[in-house]
Curated annotation (Swiss-Prot):
Ranges for domain FHA: 64-125
Protein name according to UniProt: Pleckstrin homology-like domain family B member 1
Domain commentary: The PH domain mediates the binding to phosphoinositides.
Sequence segments annotated as region (Disordered): 150-187, 211-334, 370-535, 653-707, 936-1019, 1119-1138
Residues bearing PTM Asymmetric dimethylarginine: R131
InterPro entries, per database record: FHA_dom, PH-like_dom_sf, PH-like_domain, PH_domain, PHLDB1/2/3_PH, SMAD_FHA_dom_sf
GO cellular component: basal cortex
Source species taxonomy: Eukaryota, Metazoa, Chordata, Craniata, Vertebrata
Disorder association: Osteogenesis imperfecta 23: An autosomal recessive form of osteogenesis imperfecta, a disorder of bone formation characterized by low bone mass, bone fragility and susceptibility to fractures after minimal trauma. Disease severity ranges from very mild forms without fractures to intrauterine fractures and perinatal lethality. Extraskeletal manifestations, which affect a variable number of patients, are dentinogenesis imperfecta, hearing loss, and blue sclerae.
Length: 1377
């Protein structure tokens, strides 16, 4: 069904507009939905079991193409071709053209154009089912069904070959034999004509008499409809009520080769109760095509009360007049049956349709035996029939419609008897009513079956014909008087013996004889069919063929001949002047005899005219056979001969039987000549018969011969002579009248030709105008198609633009969401980095606190160490002083003992012992390591950046070693080697060592800063930490250095005193003091350290040049004493005492000079140290300021980042709130909320808007709402109640009939219909959604299960309603999140 529901935008829209053009009613019937329209349409049931929708497909005037790729109706299903078939609608008549594809109607396959009838089921392809609905036709059919009658049965009931079909309530067995159809091999046109002719000839044969004696089926108002449900037939009352033509017609299929599609129209049927429905002529049934009759039909005058009949009704009435049983027996058993069938076959040829009329046969009714009684026996003649009105209700379809000619008042009978011409007119319609016209059946197959069954029957013997005198047991109106008169009359006896009367066969060449039945007794009407049927082919005398009839006072012969009657006669007419009434009156008898004589003359004239007609038929058939030259060319002359023999069969049955078998082989001319000779002989016999019949009739009614009567006989003979004279005059008069009739016929022919010319001109104009109308219609259709295509293109472009806009909008939203995600990720990263920095700052502060505490501890330790070192130094100085004094004493004693001889050289031994006592300390290496460890970072310092080694006195090695050990213990930083350091190798008495005074020295701050800045690989925090540590270390060393300087000053003063004491001692020793003896220790006297300054100048200067930062130790010039021995001679020999005083003075001066230099150097060093401290302090301040600035920048950056993050989050929240489809308010749950004040505060003019009634709790007003089940727009009264917390809507403002309720908890969103979704056309099952009445005023209320579309009466009302409803949208819970 998906494919079916894709009914494609183009055709779907067209179908919708087509359906919308006509009135389409949607009616709710309880749970169901009824769709009704007035135009013919198809109801599509889908293409299979999976299809669920029902589609209405309208069938407009013209052609509608159906297929899988058709432009009109596109269907998808198995077996459907692109253009499967098409349906043509011509003024309400719809015809299906299969186009060679698989199509079935009610299960029967269709191969040729077929007319569609109301309610039929179409199957296209394999499983695409469609039901055809024709509302106008259905309405008309309903009007024709009588009250209480059942609905029509299923149409298209197939007729099986070997079964009995119920037709008109009678069982008619069908034989399976099918006549051979002549298939010519030459041209297609000739073969088709011959085939149609053969089928029509085969179909002319009457029913086989196998159903004799069967009782009719149960009567019902409607018979089974074998003709597509179009013929509504009433069953006959008796077996005589069935007509042969109607039985063929009713069992015919929907379309025969010679019938137009419109020929299967329905016909009204009278119910048994006699109720007459309204006018039953539908407007949609067109006239028959001209294959049966010419279009020119003069208007027919009717008596008062006569109603016009459609051609179908007239034709139907023609079928319903059955022949008599005598005719049945005669046509069935005599060779005339075959002749009649062949003649009738010839009349059905479409080639002769406009020229050769159908043969109408007048037959008299004769009683037959029970063996020959047919189901078509009819009531007796209206002249002998008592007034029984019962058959009126059940016989024939048209009995109630046209008034019977016998309903005329008796006055009309008197008028008719005034003149022979009037009698002639009256007779015309008496016989015209008795004329049996045969309708060609529309089913050739049934006709052929009947023909074959007829040919198999043996001919009727004369004895059987004579036995037909007994009355019929099955007569509907048995009349003893009729039976007696039939038995007493000699002429019926002779006619029954011969099989037929002279008037039995009246072949009327009138194509409209079966179609237009003239119920009114006017000559114009009886001539009308003939004028319309001939084109000048026949002689003018043809028109008298239907004038055989009876005047109001008829002879018994004619009365018996008219006993077949017309079934349309509902009531009988009372007989006037019958033979029984005038048997006692001689004048009446003479008048009666005169009338009989005139009748016989008239009948002879009729026979002559019938012969002329037969000759015309023969000529036409011979001409047709010569023109065709087909297979039937040899058979057609025998048709004419057999037809002529049919006229003689009544008088000479044996001769007719004998001649019928052998005459077919004779030549046409010989057979025709013999026929005319036999007919002339039969005329003479007939005249003699009439005379004897009159005489016997007079003899029957004479009571007893008397003398009186003999005189009367003479008078009667005289009178008879007069009457004969009158008869001659009347004959002349009759001839004149015939001439007048011929002239009038010629005039009528001329009139007909003129009218035909005018009609052709009018038809040409009509066709021209019709073509113009068709062209305009095509232009209109093309214009509509173009407009529709343009509209579709615009809609497609709009849809494309809409999709493009939606894609761009979606991409924009994607970009925004991506940017928001990136911002969010960046903000999170910044927040994480900020948190890490804050944690790092906290850790740094903790480490700084730890380092501060460590620095404090180091300072305390340094103070303690300095105090301990000062104590040790004082103790060592006291020991040194004691040892020196001891040494001096020893030297004096040695001098005194040895007589001035010096001590032996023991300097090297002493130094070796000192080396053994003190561990060798690489002071230079320790100094370099200490300075490198105090540097900033792992980068190697250059040799120029590290301070040089300093010379020191050997006596201070132990102290320096201890200070080094303490420094290693208290230093928190690892010491690393800074590379190879320059070392100076001094003399054996001195070594390059670091003095304690150098502890206060450090590299310049510039080099420290440069080194710090050069270490880019260190993190900032580590560099700052190291800088802090370096600063604190420098401060600690500065304090330490100041303490050491003070200590050195004190020691300088003490050394000055000691030097003065030593100089005094040396002076004393030089001036005669005894030398000291050597101590027990064996140590030689220690050489003064000032001698070290008298080393070679080059070495001293080289060391000074190599070490620019090095200076002399403060102890180097603290002694004022002079050394006793210089160089390697340390003894104070007496030889040198003379020059010692001069040298001592020079040394003292030099020492003072050196002391001054040392003081100057000391001051310079102090100033430089102060400058360094100041620079270091400034650098620290700058670093502190820079760090504070960086921290402030970091704090401001983090604050700004925090503000940015908060701002972004706020922006997103704001955008999210703005993206809500709600208006600017959220649902308000407060109980004391004033709705009117709230709406007025929003800027709405409530008082000026007349469409809304607003109070503090309730809002009321009209809105147009789209329905849920049926998508149509209805005006509803809406009530928004905050007390009940509902939005309900009613039919009107009385609020009595509630249509629906929307609870506040279900309302999710209220928004303007900006997408115009309510204005788009869509399909909901098979109902169409019409677009919004005003899309600009449409808004939507979304609930959990449905979306309501509402249209406000004005823009202000729409805004008020949206703001009102949104205060109750409690289903919108997103804002709570």
């Amino acid at each position: 069904m998906d494919a079916l529901n894709r009914n494609q935008i183009g055709p779907g829209c067209q179908t919708q507009t087509m359906v919308q053009k006509g009135p389409l009613d949607l009616i709710e019937t309880g749970k169901g939905l009824k769709v009704q329209t007035d135009k013919p349409h198809l109801v599509s049931l889908g293409s299979g079991r999976l299809s669920t929708a029902i589609t209405l497909l309208p069938l407009e005037e013209g052609r509608t193409v159906i297929g899988s790729a058709a432009r009109d109706i596109s269907l998808q299903g198995p077996g459907l071709a692109p253009e499967h078939c098409y349906i043509e609608n011509l003024r309400g008549t719809l015809t299906l053209y299969p186009c060679g594809n698989a199509c079935t109607i009610d299960g029967l396959p269709v191969r040729q154009p077929t007319r569609l009838t109301q309610g039929c089921m179409l199957c296209l392809g394999q499983s695409t089912f469609l039901r055809f609905n024709h509302p106008a036709e259905a309405k008309w059919m309903k009007s024709m069904i009588p009250a209480g009658g059942r609905a029509p049965g299923p149409p298209y009931s197939p007729v099986p070959a070997e079964s009995e079909s119920l037709v008109n309530g009678n069982h008619t067995p069908q034989t399976a034999t099918r006549g051979p159809s002549a298939c010519a091999s030459h041209s297609s046109l000739v073969s088709s004509i011959e085939k149609d002719l053969q089928e029509i000839m085969d179909s002319l044969v009457l029913e086989e008499p196998g159903a004799a004696g069967k009782k009719p089926a149960a009567t019902s108002p409607l018979s089974p409809m074998a003709n597509g449900g179009r013929y509504l037939l009433s069953p006959p009352t008796s077996p005589g009520a069935m007509s042969v033509g109607s039985s063929y017609e009713n069992t015919s299929p929907a379309f025969s080769p010679l019938s137009s599609p419109a020929s299967s129209g329905s016909c009204a049927s009278h119910s048994p109760s006699g109720q007459e429905p309204g006018p039953s002529v539908p407007p949609l049934v067109p006239a028959r095509s001209s294959s049966y009759h010419l279009a020119l039909q003069p208007p027919q005058s009717r008596p008062s009360g006569a109603r016009s009949e459609s051609p179908r009704l007239s034709r139907k009435g023609g079928h319903e007049r059955p022949p008599s049983p005598g005719l049945r027996g005669l046509l069935t058993d005599s060779p005339a049956a075959t002749v009649l069938a062949e003649a009738r076959r010839a009349t059905e040829s479409p080639r002769l349709g406009g020229q050769l009329p159908v043969v109408a046969i007048s037959l008299s009714e004769y009683p037959a035996s029970g063996a020959l009684s047919q189901p078509t026996s009819i009531p007796g003649s209206p002249k002998f029939q008592p007034p029984v009105p019962a058959p009126r209700n059940k016989i024939g379809t048209l009995q109630d419609r046209p008034p019977s000619p016998f309903r005329e008042p008796p006055g009309s009978e008197r008028v008719l008897t005034t003149s022979p011409s009037r009698q002639l007119v009256g007779r015309t319609f008496s016989d015209g009513l008795a004329t049996r016209t045969l309708q060609p059946p529309e089913s050739p197959r049934l006709g052929r079956r009947g023909l074959d069954s007829m040919r198999e029957l043996p001919p009727l013997s004369p004895s059987l014909s004579r036995r037909a005198l007994s009355p019929l047991p099955t007569r509907t109106t048995p009349d003893p008087k009729l039976n007696r008169e039939v038995a007493e009359s000699p002429r019926p006896r002779r006619w029954a013996a011969h099989g037929a009367s002279p008037e039995d066969f009246s072949l009327t060449l009138g194509a409209r004889g079966r179609r237009t039945r003239s119920p009114s007794p006017t000559l114009g009407e009886s001539l009308a069919p003939h004028k319309g049927s001939f084109s000048g082919r026949l002689s003018p005398a043809y028109s008298l063929g239907s004038l055989t009839g009876a005047s109001p006072c008829q002879s018994p012969c004619v009365q018996r001949k008219l006993s077949s009657g017309d079934l349309r006669v509902p009531v009988t007419r009372e007989r006037k002047n019958s033979i029984t009434e005038i048997s006692d009156n001689e004048d009446d008898l003479l008048e009666y005899h005169r009338r009989q004589r005139q009748e016989r003359l008239r009948e002879q004239e009729m026979e002559r005219l019938e012969r002329q007609r037969l000759e015309t038929i023969l000529n036409l058939c011979a001409e047709y056979s010569r023109a065709d030259g087909g297979p039937e060319a040899g058979e057609l002359p025998s048709i004419g001969e057999a037809t002529a023999a049919l006229a003689l069969a009544g008088r000479r049955p044996s001769r007719g039987l004998a001649g019928a078998s052998g005459r077919s082989s004779e030549e046409p001319g010989v057979a025709t000549q013999r026929l005319w000779e036999s007919m002339e002989r039969s005329d003479e016999e007939n005249l003699k018969e009439e005379c004897s019949s009159t005489e016997s009739t007079q003899q029957e009614h004479e009571d007893a011969p008397s003398t009186k009567l003999q005189g009367e006989v003479l008078a009667l003979e005289e009178e008879r002579a007069q009457v004969l004279g009158h008869v001659e005059q009347l004959k002349v008069r009759v001839k004149e009248l015939e001439q007048q009739l011929q002239e009038s016929a010629r005039e009528a022919e001329m009139e007909r030709a003129l009218l035909q010319g005018e009609r052709e001109a009018e038809r040409a104009l009509l066709q021209k105008e019709q073509k113009a109308v068709d062209q305009l219609q095509e232009k209109l259709v093309a214009l509509e198609t173009g407009i529709q295509k343009e509209r579709d293109k615009e809609a497609e472009a709009l849809e494309t633009e809409t999709k493009l806009f939606e894609d761009l909008e979606f991409q924009q939203l994607e970009r925004e969401s991506r940017v928001e995600e990136e911002r969010e990720l960046a903000g999170q990263g910044l927040l994480r980095s900020k948190a890490e920095l804050l944690r790092s700052i906290a850790k740094r502060k903790e480490r700084l606190a730890i380092l501060d505490s460590q620095a404090g501890q180091i300072r305390a330790q340094a103070v303690q160490e300095s105090e301990r070192l000062a104590r040790d130094k004082n103790a060592s100085l006291q020991l040194l002083q004691k040892e020196k004094e001891k040494l001096t004493v020893l030297e004096r004693r040695y001098h005194s003992l040895t007589g001035g001889r010096p001590f032996p050289k023991t300097t090297s031994t002493l130094k070796e012992m000192e080396k053994l006592l003190l561990p060798a300390v690489d002071l230079e290496q320790w100094y370099q390591e200490l300075m490198a460890g105090l540097g900033t970072g792992p980068a190697a310092a250059s040799p120029h950046s590290s301070p040089p080694p300093l010379p020191a006195k050997a006596s201070r090695q132990l102290q320096v070693y201890r200070s080094k050990m303490d420094g290693e213990a208290t230093s928190p930083l690892p010491r690393t080697r800074s590379g190879p350091l320059p070392s100076s190798s001094g003399s054996s008495s001195s070594s390059s060592q670091l003095s304690v005074a150098t502890l206060g020295r450090s590299p310049s701050p510039k080099s420290a800063l440069l080194t710090q800045n050069g270490t880019g690989s260190l993190p900032r925090n580590l560099a700052a930490t190291l800088q802090d540590i370096e600063t604190k270390r420098q401060l600690a060393l500065q304090q330490k250095g100041q303490q050491v300087i003070e200590e050195q000053r004190r020691r300088l003063a003490e050394l000055k005193q000691k030097a003065a004491a030593e100089a005094q001692c040396q002076w004393d020793a030089l001036h005669g003091a005894a030398p000291f003896p050597a101590g027990p220790s064996g140590f030689p006297p220690l050489m003064h350290h000032s001698i070290l300054h008298h080393l070679p100048a080059g070495r001293e200067r080289g060391e000074e040049g190599e070490h620019a930062y090095d200076t002399l130790s403060l102890e180097s010039s603290d002694s004022m004493e002079t050394s006793i021995s210089t160089g390697g001679n340390s003894a104070c020999s007496p030889d040198n005492m003379s020059s010692a005083s001069g040298l001592d003075m020079g040394k003292i001066e030099e020492m003072e000079k050196m002391l001054k230099e040392a003081h100057a150097e000391k001051n310079r060093l102090m100033e430089s140290r102060e400058r360094e401290m100041e620079l270091r302090r400034q650098a620290l301040e700058e670093e502190r300021r820079r760090r504070e600035q960086v921290e402030r920048r970091l704090q401001s950056e983090s604050a700004r980042r925090q503000q940015l993050v908060e701002k972004e989050v706020k922006m997103r929240e704001k955008q999210f709130s703005q993206a809500r489809p709600l208006t600017r308010y959220l649902p308000i749950r407060k109980e004391d909320f004033d709705l009117k004040t709230h709406i007025e505060s929003s800027g709405h003019g409530v008082d000026t808007c007349l469409h809304v009634v607003l109070s503090s709790k309730v809002c009321r007003g009209y809105l147009v709402k789209m329905g849920g089940k049926i998508k149509s727009w209805k005006k509803r009264w809406f009530v928004f109640d905050r007390l009940k917390r509902t939005l309900s809507y009613y039919v009107d403002k009385h609020e009595t009939k509630l249509k629906g309720v929307i609870y506040f908890q279900a309302i999710e969103e209220v928004y303007y219909d900006h997408l115009r979704s309510a204005a788009k056309k869509r399909f909901f099952r098979f109902t169409m959604v019409t677009e919004s009445p005003n899309p600009a005023l449409t808004f939507c209320v979304k609930t959990h299960d449905r979306l309501y579309y509402m249209v406000a009466p004005s823009a202000e009302a729409m805004r008020i309603w949206m703001d009102v409803i949104v205060t109750g949208a409690e289903g919108y819970t997103q804002f709570m999140n």
